[in-house]
């Protein structure tokens, strides 16, 4: 942006800078007014409908992403998402690379030994996705060494292992879906909402869902570094406020067409119902 008048150039540059500062994306804009740093959030954006990239690849979307943004709004902070492999989420907290994780992570006692969890914002069970003409009609049909696709490091992988299934491990939930569609896998275990979403969209007319009644209820929760109890408590309050205002229910209705289920009020209560 060059002009023959130096004064005009400086003025134009100042206006441009001001415009960029005020008009950039809501998650990247400066937070000078509040003096609060952006909330750095690690996510593995491959898990439809919880966290995934928009069609143009420029933005993050999904139920959990919406909840994060609502929480950040309660805290008066902007959000900066960082896309990280699922098995790198906890290390990213431990190294202080990020402030919080938001990636369909179940609060478990094992993980709680490494990080802090906020109050849960979602409850679900596991489900199996299999082709419509598959002989699999119950979990019992998958035991005795049956091969199943799972995302490594997840409760689905632990469940399959406990049941004696032969595991085909993948880094991302989206890889499981691609493998099912390509015919390389005859079954995959996902969280039930993800399974239902796939069968209703990309897998429509070709796949079906088999419930896993003996899987325990899983509570999804945001994670924090062990030394960041202050942020954990702030997020706990924000989640409680979102429940009270009805915002969490609105977001749940938006993505799942059902009211938000009743959940434990604290992580400690949730951990009493998980392994």
PLM features: residue spans?
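Extracytoplasmic small-molecule ligand-binding "clamshell" domains
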Residues: 32-104
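Extended ligand-binding regions for polar small-molecule ligands
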Residues: 25, 65-74, 140, 154, ...
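Acidic, polar ligand-binding/catalytic clefts
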Residues: 69, 78-141, 208, 214
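Ligand-binding clefts/hinges and TM-proximal coupling segments of bilobed small-molecule sensing domains
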Residues: 26-32, 155-171, 207-209, 239-275
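Short, low-complexity disordered leader/linker segments with a strong preference
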Residues: 1-38, 273-275
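Bilobed "Venus flytrap"/periplasmic-binding protein-like clamshell domains
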Residues: 41, 46-48, 60-73, 125-177, ...
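A ligand-binding cleft/hinge motif common to bilobed small-molecule-binding domains
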Residues: 91, 105-113, 159-162, 186-216
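Periplasmic-binding protein-like
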Residues: 45, 123-130, 192, 200-237, ...
């Amino acid at each position: 942006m060059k002009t023959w008048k130096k004064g005009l150039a400086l003025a134009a540059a100042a206006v441009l800078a001001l415009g960029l500062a005020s008009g950039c994306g809501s998650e990247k804009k400066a937070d000078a007014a509040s003096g609060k740093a952006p909330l750095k959030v690690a996510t593995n954006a491959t898990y439809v409908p919880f966290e995934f990239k928009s069609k143009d690849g420029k933005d993050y979307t999904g139920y959990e992403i919406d909840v994060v943004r609502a929480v950040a709004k309660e805290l008066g902070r902007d959000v900066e998402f960082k896309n990280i492999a699922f098995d790198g989420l906890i290390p990213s907290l431990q190294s202080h690379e990020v402030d919080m994780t938001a990636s369909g992570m179940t609060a478990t006692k094992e993980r709680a030994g490494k990080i802090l969890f906020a109050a849960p914002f979602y409850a679900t069970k596991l489900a199996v996705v299999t082709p419509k003409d598959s002989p699999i009609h119950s979990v019992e049909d998958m035991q005795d060494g049956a091969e199943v696709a799972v995302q490594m490091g997840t409760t689905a992988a632990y469940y399959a292992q406990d049941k004696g299934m032969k595991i085909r491990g993948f880094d991302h939930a989206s890889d499981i879906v691609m493998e099912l569609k390509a015919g390389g896998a005859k079954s995959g275990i996902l969280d039930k909402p993800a399974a239902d979403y796939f069968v209703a969209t990309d897998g429509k007319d070709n796949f079906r869902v088999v419930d896993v009644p003996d899987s325990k209820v899983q509570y999804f929760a945001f994670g924090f570094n062990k030394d960041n109890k202050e942020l954990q408590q702030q997020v706990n309050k924000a989640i409680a406020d979102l429940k009270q205002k009805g915002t969490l229910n609105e977001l749940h209705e938006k993505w799942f067409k059902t009211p938000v289920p009743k959940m434990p009020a604290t992580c400690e209560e949730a951990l009493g119902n998980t392994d």
